[in-house]
C-alpha cells in the first residue's frame, strides 16, 4: 500500500494551498514537512529532490513532483477530477488558468507597498466583478448544470471555490451578484471531504501577511 503524499513547503498558503485543497477534496490524507529555514531548502536542493530548485514539491507514488500545475494535473488525473476526454480537460485547463490569474493577484496583495494597496485592492475588485466572476457565472448559466464541466466535480470546481473564499476574504460583497457561483460554493463546501477540510484544526492554512511572505521569499527562489 502506497504511503500518504508528503508535501514540502512552508507553513502557509502560497502555491501549495491549491494542492492541499485538491487532495482534501479527493479524500486523500497527506503529510506536510514544513520548510522553516534556508538550510531546510538547501537540504532538499542538495539531495536532488527539487528538479528546478523550487518548491512546492510533493512526494507521491515514488515521484518527487515539482511545478504546481504538474502536481495538480497528476492528482486530478489520479483521482478522476480531470474530465472524461481531451475536450473536457481543455475546458478544465482553461477555467483553472483563469482562476490562477485572479488568485495570483490576491496572493501577492500583501506585498503591495502601503501607499499602493488601496489602488491594488480596487483593481482586484474591479477585475473580479467585471472579468473573472461574470465569466464563471456565464459558464454555469450556459449549461444549467451543477458543476463547470461535464456535470461532474472536477479540479476546476475545487480551485474556483477555493478562489471564491479568497474573494470573500477580500470583500464579502463581491459575490452578491453571482447567485450561481454562490450556489457552487455552497455545493462544493458541503461535500463531506471539503466540509472536513474547512473545519478548524484541518491542514487548511490561514491568510498570509506581508511579513510571512517576505520571510519565505528570502530563501525560496522564484
Swiss-Prot record:
Modified residues (N-acetylmethionine): 1
Compartments where located: Cytoplasm
Entry keyword annotation includes Transferase: yes
Residues that hold glutathione according to the record: 9, 54-55, 67-68
UniProt catalytic activity: RX + glutathione = an S-substituted glutathione + a halide anion + H(+); prostaglandin A2 + glutathione = prostaglandin A2-S-(R)-glutathione; prostaglandin J2 + glutathione = prostaglandin J2-S-(R)-glutathione; (13S)-hydroperoxy-(9Z,11E)-octadecadienoate + 2 glutathione = (13S)-hydroxy-(9Z,11E)-octadecadienoate + glutathione disulfide + H2O
Pfam family, one: GST_N
Keywords of this entry: Acetylation, Cytoplasm, Transferase
Modified-residue entries (N6-succinyllysine), positions: 4
Basic and acidic residues composition-biased segments: 206-222
Gene Ontology CC: cytosol
SUPFAM superfamilies: GST C-terminal domain-like, Thioredoxin-like
Its EC number(s): 2.5.1.18
Principal location listed in the UniProt entry: cytoplasm
Molecular-function GO terms, alphabetical: glutathione transferase activity
BP GO annotations: glutathione metabolic process; xenobiotic metabolic process
CDD domains per UniProt: GST_C_Alpha, GST_N_Alpha
Residue span(s) of domain GST C-terminal: 85-208
N-acetylalanine found at: 2
Domain GST N-terminal: 3-83
Stretches for region Disordered: 199-222
Family statement drawn from the similarity comment of this UniProt entry: Belongs to the GST superfamily. Alpha family.
Biological role stated in the UniProt entry: Glutathione S-transferase that catalyzes the nucleophilic attack of the sulfur atom of glutathione on the electrophilic groups of a wide range of exogenous and endogenous compounds. Involved in the formation of glutathione conjugates of both prostaglandin A2 (PGA2) and prostaglandin J2 (PGJ2). It also catalyzes the isomerization of D5-androstene-3,17-dione (AD) into D4-androstene-3,17-dione and may therefore play an important role in hormone biosynthesis.
The protein's assembly and partners: Homodimer or heterodimer of GSTA1 and GSTA2.
Protein name: Glutathione S-transferase alpha M14
Amino acid at each position: 500500500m502506497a504511503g500518504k503524499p508528503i508535501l514540502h513547503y512552508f507553513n502557509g498558503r502560497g502555491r501549495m494551498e491549491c494542492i492541499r485543497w485538491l487532495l482534501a477534496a479527493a479524500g486523500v490524507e497527506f503529510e506536510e514537512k514544513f520548510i522553516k529555514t534556508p538550510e531546510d531548502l538547501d537540504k532538499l536542493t542538495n539531495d536532488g529532490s527539487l528538479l528546478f530548485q523550487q518548491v512546492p514539491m510533493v512526494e507521491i507514488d515514488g515521484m518527487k513532483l515539482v511545478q504546481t500545475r504538474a502536481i495538480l494535473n497528476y492528482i486530478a488525473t489520479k483521482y478522476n477530477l480531470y474530465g472524461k476526454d481531451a475536450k473536457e480537460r481543455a475546458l478544465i485547463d482553461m477555467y483553472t488558468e483563469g482562476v490562477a490569474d485572479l488568485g495570483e493577484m490576491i496572493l501577492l496583495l500583501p506585498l503591495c507597498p502601503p501607499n499602493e494597496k488601496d489602488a491594488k485592492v480596487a483593481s482586484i475588485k474591479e477585475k473580479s466583478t467585471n472579468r473573472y466572476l461574470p465569466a464563471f457565472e456565464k459558464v454555469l448559466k450556459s449549461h444549467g448544470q451543477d458543476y463547470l464541466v461535464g456535470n461532474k466535480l472536477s479540479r476546476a470546481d475545487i480551485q474556483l471555490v477555493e478562489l471564491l473564499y479568497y474573494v470573500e476574504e477580500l470583500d464579502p460583497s463581491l459575490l452578491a451578484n453571482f447567485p450561481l457561483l454562490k450556489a457552487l460554493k455552497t455545493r462544493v463546501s458541503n461535500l463531506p471531504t471539503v466540509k472536513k477540510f474547512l473545519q478548524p484544526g484541518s491542514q487548511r492554512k490561514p491568510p498570509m501577511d506581508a511579513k510571512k511572505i517576505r520571510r519565505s521569499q528570502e530563501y525560496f527562489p522564484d
